[in-house]
Amino acid sequence: MGKLIKYISILLIVVLVLSACGKSSNKDEGVKDATKTEASKHKGGTLNVALTAPPSGVYSSLLNSTHADAVVEGYFNENLLTIDKKIRPKAYIASWKDIEPAKKIEFKIKKGIKWHDGNELKIDDWIYSIEVLANKDYEGAYYPSVENIQGAKDYHEGKADHISGLKKIDDYTMQVTFDKKQENYLTGFITGPLLSKKYLSDVPIKDLAKSDKIRKYPIGIGPYKVKKIVPGEAVQLVKFDDYWQGKPALDKINLKVIDQAQIIKAMEKGDIDVTNDATGAMAKDAKSSNAGLKVLSAPSLDYGLIGFVSHDYDKKANKTGKVRPKYEDKELRKAMLYAIDREKWIKAFFNGYASEINSFVPSMHWIAADPKELNDYKYDPEKAKKILDKLGYKDRDVDGFREDPKGNKFEINFKHYSGSNPTFEPRTAAIKDFWEKVGLKTNVKLVEFGKYNEDLANASKDMEVYFRSWAGGTDPDPSDLYHTDRPQNEMRTVLPKSDQYLDDALDFDKVGIDEKKRKDIYVKWQKYMNDELPGLPMFQGKSITIVNDKVRNLDIEIGTDQSLYNLTKEA
């Protein structure tokens, strides 16, 4: 009975929230948020930061950590390259020069950069990090990022004891030779955060992700070093006096996992200074607060979709198996998208901090297709019903829900990860409501985040339809998520035409350094995927950070030169 009451209450929230969308008179509508705080030269003090989700504890993004883990890692470790405002690579700790474009490249790292254990960052650390990804015992998702390095395949298969395409010139320089020329040889290359060879080489690679050196005592080269970790709850950091750009402005940073429904209250009380990865609902509450809270927002590379696990998958062999036919017909998927009022759904649960998307590429990227070239799948429940009727999905037993074309019961099993975000349940229930209005019986289930990821990684039999959001990077190429047999291709799509487009867009012999040629191919891919709909594009989001009136030197815009070591809080 308790579960039933809870579920009814969720549906009631959905009805109230969605019906209120058309009547909004939010006083902040149309007000543009800032992207940065004021500047200050203040030194010292402690910054308290809210984590909106608990980390799993794998504090290395090379070892297949979650977004929450990567957020923590960002406070104590750094990338070797950064990006400019056009999302292009920019020299930082490392610089590069082409020896033979797309075939051989030389990297140099700065001298004198220290790991938190006092050892100097060397080119051996970079080589070691790449060898971890190419090792046969590596269980993460990023081997495809290094497999085009000459000799990586032999090393991966145990036929060689080193990767022949990695040539150490000296302690700060290496040359990398690739098997075949690919246009994203730089943006797709592993440029950090790295693993320390001296610190970790005594740990078997198969045990790295579960080792204390990663989970309890991780080290990096960033401005703050880890002092204490309370698993799933908190991370304490202190300034690293030997940081390569100078002593950081703050003395300490405390990261605390806070229930999302309580974050604004914690900020109003002064317990929290900064909340990254904030939601639209938090931003709305912050703007109505009298505690001097400030909302920063900027365009991001985040987007969300509803996916379909289309094939069986052998994770150990990394091979896609037989088709799962339930959602095989793209017309069924189109009907499911037409049935969703995405505009209303986004207004209800993102409070203006997201917009509809019809592509699998965020519009910020230079390869993004013009929206006018894509079917926008505007909400049209009558069209959805007509498609379903034509396909043979009809309500034969007059129970209000459609059976499949063979007359069998048809139910959508839709999953979403659980967490402290109070919108997860109502926004999932809203999708259920949209689908059931066109006669598609839907079961929804929220699953613990770790198990959810594991089920997707293994294409578990009970994982059918699911929600996922992705954050893009400097490399706009979407192959990792949509190319057949890529570990991160959670939908397990097998679309030869899609694969061919993606391969052609990286083929240096076909596109060279001509970005227009490359973009033209990606636009063709987006048009194809927009028609094929292996998943349902839902939204692209904004980056939201909430701060109190004491935080200084924070800029969240992509490509900013503002560094974490300058971040400070006035007394």
Please report, for each region that a protein language model flagged, where it lies by residue:
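Extracytoplasmic/peripheral linker and loop segments enriched in polar/acidic and small residues
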Residues: E38, K334, I346, K441-Y452, ...
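Append "and occasionally in soluble cytosolic enzymes with long acidic Gly/Pro-rich linkers
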Residues: K326-D433, K524
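Aromatic- and charge-enriched surface segment that lines or borders ligand/interaction sites
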Residues: S95-Y142, Q175, A266, K326-Y327
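Ligand-site clamp/hinge motif
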Residues: A209-R215, F240-A286, K441
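Long beta-strand-rich cores associated with HINT superfamily self-processing modules
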Residues: V547-A571
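Gly/Pro-rich hinge or "lid" segments in bacterial periplasmic/extracellular proteins
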Residues: N184, F189-P248, K252, Q262, ...
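Surface-exposed binding/hinge segments that line
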Residues: Y143-D202
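N-terminal lobe/hinge region of extracytoplasmic solute-binding protein
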Residues: A50-E100, E131, I219
